[in-house]
């Protein structure tokens, strides 16, 4: 069957669910699509369809970020269901880097947990501009005072990570209960109404993002597929600019640079002639083998961005109370650095100055020189996260690039 063309009639936003493992992110995503499928053309996605990777089903947790589409009366959303499990924060960073806004899911029975904090920190670091909160599983909490305490704790946590706790929309409900009643076609039930309130808050509380469509095209590659007889497809979010059929583009990163031609563009299995900043797309490339491309490379307008392996940065090292290191580190320290969809090991050098420190302590704000194992596409002002041993230990911004 021939694929349909993607018609852009509504504002497109990238949204996502973030939060601690088992707090109900995937169930909420399933409930949203099920509800919207009853009132418009959205395709319902079950929990098992969203949690679709075989390893995920076996463990009952989301590992890769799942991309789902749905429509409200006002907007078209690409929804990214992000992993909450600590082992898979790396994939969450990729998902969060693509979001215009996020739904932070917090279980009312637990309140904020370690990954709740880490997801908020990473959301801030990769530039997620707006957050709304779904306080889930309230059917399991009988004490209203306890609910109020959890809400207060969530608002305080939002303030810590520079999201305005006082003005953030917090919607209380139960994703599982809503899903049960939607499946019974009882859309006037109170649990379904709570879910409807959340969907309305999405439309109202997440502002329409300003897209950089006039800047040179840039897409950070998230995944790569081979299509027999057609070639290689790369997927990811367009960070800025536009791309159209037959455009010439550079693939660069990890010490490689190749030039190729765009021979197809798709979004949610529908064909596009042109795609622009904010779109989550698959791009078919001429004459490129799957093994030549890897996640973390970028597609870009030729010569609009260059690769570097060394840069200076302003960095904040998390304190132990923020989930960071407990001990200081010294020159030569080698953590992982995360940019868009890339993660690369790098070596830290303390910048020479009159009071050059011997060591850097958790909680310090410092300027560092970083040498990466590979050259990757970098720019001034680009933000990154620093991780070691399965946890985020710092966050930074590039202030200078070194040839």
Curated annotation (Swiss-Prot):
Localization (cell)? Plastid, Apicoplast
- Give all residue intervals belonging to the tr-type G domain: 10-210
For this protein, the Enzyme Commission number is: 3.6.5.3
Give Gene Ontology CC terms: apicoplast; mitochondrion
- Catalyses which reaction? GTP + H2O = GDP + phosphate + H(+)
Q: Which domain of life is it from?
A: Eukaryota
Q: Where is this region: G2?
A: 60-64
Q: Does the keyword Cell inner membrane apply?
A: no
Record: residues binding GTP: 19-26, 81-85, 136-139
The entry marks the following residues as binding Mg(2+), namely: 26
Q: Where is this region: G1?
A: 19-26
G3: region residues: 81-84
Region (G4) residue ranges read 136-139
A single GO molecular function, which one?
Answer: translation elongation factor activity
Spell out the residue ranges making up region: G5: 174-176
Q: Which GO terms describe its biological process?
A: mitochondrial translational elongation
Keyword annotations of the record: Apicoplast, Elongation factor, GTP-binding, Hydrolase, Magnesium, Metal-binding, Nucleotide-binding, Plastid, Protein biosynthesis
Question: What SUPFAM superfamilies does the record point to?
Answer: EF-Tu/eEF-1alpha/eIF2-gamma C-terminal domain, P-loop containing nucleoside triphosphate hydrolases, Translation proteins
Function text: GTP hydrolase that promotes the GTP-dependent binding of aminoacyl-tRNA to the A-site of ribosomes during protein biosynthesis.
Q: Which PANTHER family match?
A: ELONGATION FACTOR TU, MITOCHONDRIAL, ELONGATION FACTOR TU-RELATED
What the record says about family reads: Belongs to the TRAFAC class translation factor GTPase superfamily. Classic translation factor GTPase family. EF-Tu/EF-1A subfamily.
Protein name per UniProt: Elongation factor Tu, apicoplast
Organism from which the protein derives: Eimeria tenella (Coccidian parasite)
What gene makes this protein? tufA
